Amino acid sequence: MATSQRKILVTSALPYANGPIHLGHMLEYIQTDIWSRYQKLRGHECHYICADDAHGTPIMLKAQQLGMAPEEMIAQVNKEHQQDFADFNIAFDNYHSTHSEENRVLASDIYLKLRANGYIKSKSISQLFDPEKSMFLPDRFVKGTCPKCKSPDQYGDNCDACGATYSPTELINPKSAVSGATPVMKDTEHFFFDLPAFEDMLKEWTRSGALQTEMANKLDEWFEQGLQQWDITRDAPYFGFEIPDAPGKYFYVWLDAPIGYMGSFKNLCDKRPELSFDEFWAKDSKAEVYHFIGKDIVYFHSLFWPAMLHGSGYRQPNSVYAHGYVTVNGAKMSKSKGTFIKARTYLDHLDPEYLRYYYAAKLSSRIDDLDLNLEDFAQRVNSDLVGKLVNLASRTAGFITKRFDGKLAKIADTTLTDAFLAKQEQIAEFYETREYGKAMREIMALADIANGFVADAAPWQLVKQDDQQEVAHQVCSNALNLFRILVTYLKPVLPRLAQDVEAFFQQTLTWDGLGQDMAGHEIAPFKAMMQRVEFDKVEAMVADSKENLQATSEPEAPKGPLATDPISDTINFDDFAKIDLRIARIVKAEHVAEADKLLKLQLDIGGETRQVFAGIKSAYSPEDLEGKLTVMVANLAPRKMRFGMSEGMVLAAGPGGSDLWILEPHEGAQPGMRVK
């Protein structure tokens, strides 16, 4: 079915230019590349752009460690990044750097427009200063204990444990991440972006469908906490763009980083005069702009970025799509275990098409983490791509070449073809909505049908019978046409395989050509298109990824849950005694509208009923909970939430998601009993 042409600009988050690409990064670029390739396959004008994020103190310090100028280091890293992406068949239309003239001009332009419109404030602040290095400490170069949840070893801008944002001066027991020294306070003048002025606009935008439900719900929490003015200044020494009219003051990297999307597109427009920058970025633009990002940078892309664009007279993105993290074999990527795998190490051992397919098979439109289980990876690739897909052609193509002059027959019974073509709109919708896993399941279900057809018809038996030659010709031609349709459906995911299949069919695979009559079409001799995953190659990749641990007397690293969630700092008995734990019976449980993770619980604690909102929806349905006994914190200060008042906390174990288990006391415990 023909569709009207859309004008689309799509981006992936900019990789930081201080190190190599790894398989965690690759999830996002594969996800975006599939979506971009799908749009182009449908005939839309789609531009996929990206750049290296090349500014900030980490760049400056890494270059110093290497004995290089920052400009030299980021140029080298940029070259390495582009080679890794190219070898993974990531088809950027332009790849640039935030350390570019286009980006400097745009960053200054946006800042000056924000200042002229009254959205830039200036004030003197006290900032942490490293007395040993004689430098102000940016937020990521201060570590300490989170002021909100008290988790140790957190950065100075946000907490990885609870997601809270704060200023470096709010950290408990801060230390310089550069020297380890205890920082001192020193006054300096900084410029702030007036984010609270955009609260109404942001609330409207975040509920316009621009964000996934999980993201929109998270933003509601931030709105409840109140938006704060955003410090966009860093003091010299700093590698970045100097702020206009402010010598010695530089733009914070997160101001010019998202502007890098615009800078890269401006660079593309300068190379291709037929493209108009304003057509995509002007306030009244009718083109579409989409950002694919990781869930760790939602705050910047869903609050600061649209507000900056709005305040400086540019358009906002249509949508910001977030994805989760990559784990390997069910655990956080580990250098010691060899599961922190660099893109180049993977490429040294395995076909990039394997990973593209595996990620696609597990991706959805949600922000769930994705586990790269290496045994499942090998099994799924071998089963789906080799055993089902390519095998369909390898079992039938030779008969066409040897017995029928390499030409396909006119298919008399089009029942199977019609059934395959009937799935195109469903598969298209799955691609459009980023439900790649559903698309892969649909396509592989069709592959099963096609293979069943070939197995039942057994053309290898038919060709031995003189009176069955035409039937054999029909069967093999039908199978190859189904193979052509399947690979066309998979073309956004498997571009290299699609090229091989195009050479085999001697024609370009197009979405509009799915229903093409292939009668009389001549094919080329079949060549092997994909090899099985040999697990010893997977093991070799893991071995090459391991970093040798120094032979020291350090204690053995914790195993199990302690490996990723270490025991917190020691407290004394008096601290623990302040916590009043009580047995509670869940008398009622229900869903909370517009809350992705919460259930509303009514808890009987022996003569008193408490209402508690618990983040356990991913693990329990309300009907599973009613009547159960559990343990609650009874003297926790009530917290007013958008959905109502939460009067305590239930206790659960586990890392989160579906892996959560509420605590259940033994039989005999009664509501209201104290837990000691």
Swiss-Prot record:
One of its GO terms (molecular function) is tRNA binding. A motif ('KMSKS' region) lies at residues 332-336. It comes from the Bacteria. The keyword Ligase applies. Homodimer. The keyword Transmembrane does not apply. Binds 1 zinc ion per subunit. A motif ('HIGH' region) lies at residues 15-25. It is an enzyme of class 6 (ligase). It comes from Shewanella sp. (strain MR-4). Is required not only for elongation of protein synthesis but also for the initiation of all mRNA translation through initiator tRNA(fMet) aminoacylation. Belongs to the class-I aminoacyl-tRNA synthetase family. MetG type 1 subfamily. PROSITE patterns: AA_TRNA_LIGASE_I, TRBD. Residues 575-676 form the tRNA-binding domain. Keywords: Aminoacyl-tRNA synthetase, ATP-binding, Cytoplasm, Ligase, Metal-binding, Nucleotide-binding, Protein biosynthesis, RNA-binding, tRNA-binding, Zinc. This is Methionine--tRNA ligase. It catalyses: tRNA(Met) + L-methionine + ATP = L-methionyl-tRNA(Met) + AMP + diphosphate. One of its GO terms (biological process) is methionyl-tRNA aminoacylation. PANTHER family: METHIONINE--TRNA LIGASE, METHIONINE--TRNA LIGASE, CYTOPLASMIC. One of its GO terms (cellular component) is cytosol. InterPro entries: aa-tRNA-synth_I_CS (IPR001412), Anticodon_Met (IPR041872), Met-tRNA-synth_bsu_C (IPR004495), Met-tRNA_ligase_1 (IPR023458), Met-tRNA_synth (IPR014758), Methionyl/Leucyl_tRNA_Synth (IPR015413), MetRS_core (IPR033911), MetRS_Zn (IPR029038). Its EC number is 6.1.1.10. Its cofactor is Zn(2+). It is found in: Cytoplasm. Zn(2+) binds at C146, C149, C159, C162. ATP binds at K335.
